[in-house]
Design a protein with these regions (language model features):
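TOPRIM fold recognition
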Residues: 2-9, 15-154
């Protein structure tokens, strides 16, 4: 969504998210169906490079920095977890399911970085709404939500 050949392109997941982010920012967004749906990224980014793109921002959802600790809030699976009844507010208990999700998302982020490197495109990962530990603070998830939050601050 935006102008093919823009020097800077933002990659995010989901066409609706990209449409809204473009409408809010005027920037060019390349939308993938999901963070691990990278099969078409190489040819599309290569074509965009030929049209003038030089820099790619990875703007996937912030659950890429999901805190992988038990809080009894992840899903129905929490009730089946042996840690579910523990007092997770007083101790840090690792959550295997959240760690698996975070690892899967980060594989997609790394794949985008590899593609950019192979094509000779510079890139950077965008983050927002992080806590002091660098994990997602769980207030603002997508780049579209972030842009809306910025507008409400003004």
């Amino acid at each position: 969504v935006g102008k093919p050949g823009d020097k800077t392109v933002f990659v995010t997941e989901g066409p609706l998210k990209g449409d809204l982010a473009h409408a809010l920012s005027g920037r060019t967004f390349l939308c993938v169906p999901g963070v691990n749906q990278s099969v078409n990224l190489m040819p599309v980014l290569n074509e965009m490079k030929e049209l003038g793109t030089r820099f790619v921002y990875e703007a996937y959802d912030m659950d890429k920095l999901l805190r992988p600790v038990c809080q009894g809030d992840y899903s129905e699976n929490c009730k089946e977890c042996p840690c579910y009844r523990m007092d997770w507010k007083k101790q840090s208990i690792p959550c295997e399911k959240k760690q698996i999700k975070r690892d899967n998302i980060n594989r997609g982020c790394n794949k985008l970085a590899e593609i950019c490197k192979e094509l000779g495109l510079e890139g950077k990962t965008l983050t927002w709404d992080t806590d002091t530990d660098g994990n997602w603070a769980e207030n603002v998830k997508g780049v579209d939500d972030y842009l809306v939050a910025l507008q409400h601050r003004e």
